[in-house]
């Protein structure tokens, strides 16, 4: 839809696990969940890098996630922690959200998990970026909760 209705717009897709990498639209149906952690910082960093090279004024990030950042790359090594929300990883992730806000890049997060502690994190992430969040589970994609920190709204949609 984006490429046909808005031919001057671009759509870049980034997958992120331990690292982040761009993928082509045609390869999206073949993307699989891997034995990875979630390096949200790397995904956002790559997205910002791609957007900085674009000459358009309307820059946005749409992120689909389970809401649980569990990995950082420090030099050549990975710092991983899958147990709970690690403050070191969370703080770096929130720093990326704040960086995007300062660059004028809103993040719309589609969270596909119902865990209350992960929803609290996504809420904090969304507030830090002044972005938007949609909450759902994989089994309930027809119903989701929408939070808009730009307009300070929260509502349930079906």
Over which residues does each language-model region extend?
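Arginine/glycine-rich "motif VI" loop of SF2 helicases in the C-terminal RecA-like domain
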Residues: 3-8, 52-53, 98-105
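VWA/integrin I-like adhesion module and closely mimicked acidic/polar interface patches used
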Residues: 37, 67-128
